[in-house]
Each structure stands twice: as structure tokens, then as C-alpha cells.
Amino acid sequence: IKPACMPWGEKGGDGHGVNATNTIRAKAILRSITGNIDKIGGDQLTMPGDRGGTEDMNFNHNDLSQEQRDKMIGNERFPGLTFKGWDIISKAYPRFYPYSNAPLLFKAMITGEPYPVKACIVQADNPMLAFTNTKLVYEALKSLDLLVVHDYFMTPTAALADYALPAATWLERCSRGYPTMDVEQVSMAGSMPVVERFEGGTDVDFRDDYEFWYGLADRLGFGDKYWGPTMEDMMDGQVEPFGMKFRDFCEKVKYLKVPNKPEKYKEPGFKFLTPTGKVELYSTVIEELAKETGQDFDPLPNFVFPPDFPEVNPEYAAEYPLCM
């Protein structure tokens, strides 16, 4: 059927369980072999277009020594998420961000293995409700020497924190959004805070996410990695190619449409963000990770029985004869 779009699933339902990665990979492969990539009515490939700016002024992971990168919890067991995967994927996709596996991180907080984790900063999350095994999460957070939460509300996690810091809401910060992103256009909109915060030299007790991290980075000597001390400084960098400041963009332009052509892969020199530059039905990234770690990673999607299925644990069969 053409054109056809295969959505990711309501609330990321296909991203749970032991088959999550293979399910998502299989869907991506089906998009490819049915010819429904980047077509009107199919699955889009939205691109940066001409909006440009200094958007890629991100912290360079190469600033971390290899010794520090090797310490990332989960490097061996879940290399696709961590710096092991980043070393491979970032060559084609520089904006890939590595991170640790959360359950392993919680266990490290409690046990001190592979090394002690003594502090945690929580932002845009509530681990006490967001993760399974709440008792484990509670024990992990209580094991920390320092827990900082930056949030709108006094969540259960914030209630455990040594410092609960108020975050700026959408009314109190600069915002930039993309109301529509399809194969024909990418739309960009911007807004200034409804509550002006710095007029007359006065300040308030809340901070937006950008200010929070800039303030910490500046005190640690990394302030030059940022656009400036405020989110408006960052937004100015986003609209720099248009020859205006972000405040002017919000007042004069407000809404911008950037053309986005379908079937961009037909253009000379186009490459997909894979090591081969092609749509990979057989993942060269997973193949390389398997070689590096010695783990049995299949470059092609396969099915794995969940741990509570009779095929894996026959003891369940008598009590639960029907598995769905």
C-alpha cells in the first residue's frame, strides 16, 4: 500500500520489553522495503533546512578523556546506549547522545559497584514514579550524598531531594517550537516570556533549564561552551541567519515556514545517517558492537521470548498456560 505511514505507536508502546529494539528496527526496515520513506503520505525525513544558526554549539563529548568515557555505567552490557555506541554512531550522526542504563545506575547508587555514585541531578523527570521497582529507586535515591531536583512541582522525588529548585514554566521562559513538520515544510514559531524577569535589574527565584545548566557550567569553567547566560542568548543564536534577534523574530515574524522537499534521498550526495550512508537492513553498528563486546547481538531483527514465558521458564506454564 502506497503511500503508507507506520506510526511509532501510542505512548511508545513498541519501545517496551526485551523485543523493543528489534520491533522498532523491523518497522524501520518495512518502511524502507515498501518504499514509504520521505514521501507525501509516507514517513517523513525532516531536515534542518535553511534555518541554520549556531544550533550545533553543543558540549563536545571529545572533551571527556577516554578514561572518563570508559567509566560510563552500562558500557559493556548496553553498549548501544553508551559511549561504546557513540564512538561508532557519532561518525555518521554527531548529535547522538549517550546515556547510562537507569536500573544499572540505581543499583550502583546502592552497592557502590562498579564505583560509588554519590550525587544526582534530576530534571524533567520523577524517578519515583517514572521507573518500575519503586522500592529500589527509593533506596537508591536515599543512598546519595546529594540529590538535586529542578521541577515545577514538589514531586515525590523532589520531596526526597536535598535541594528542590523551582523551574520556569512556559509562561516564564523563551520558547521555540515546530508546530508542523512534514515532507513539504518545517514550521518554526517562537515566543518570549509572558512574565518579564530581568527588567529593572530584578530577579526571581526560578530558572529555566538552560540557565540552570549554564550556571553550573560557568562555575565549573565551561561557560564558554554556551551562547551566553540566558535562554534568550541561545535563541539569538538560533535565528542568527535571519539577521535578527530572537525578540525581533517573536514580535515581527512569529511564525516561519521552511521548505522541506520530499524524496531527498534522490538528491546527489545525500546520505542517510548510518556508517554506510545507506538504509541499513543489516546494521553495521550492531555488527561492530557485537565484535567489540563479544556479545550475541544480531545485526538483523530477531524475536526473543520474554523471561516470564514458558519457553524460557517452564515453571510458569502450569500456572499461566496462555501467553499473549
Predicted features along the sequence, with ranges:
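Non-catalytic alpha/beta scaffold blocks inside enzyme catalytic domains
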Residues: 1-29, 33-39, 48-51, 64-241
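Short clusters of hydrophobic/aromatic residues that line enzyme substrate/ligand-binding pockets
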Residues: 44, 176, 194-195, 272, ...
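Long, low-complexity segments enriched in small/aliphatic residues
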Residues: 22, 54-63, 70-72, 86-89, ...
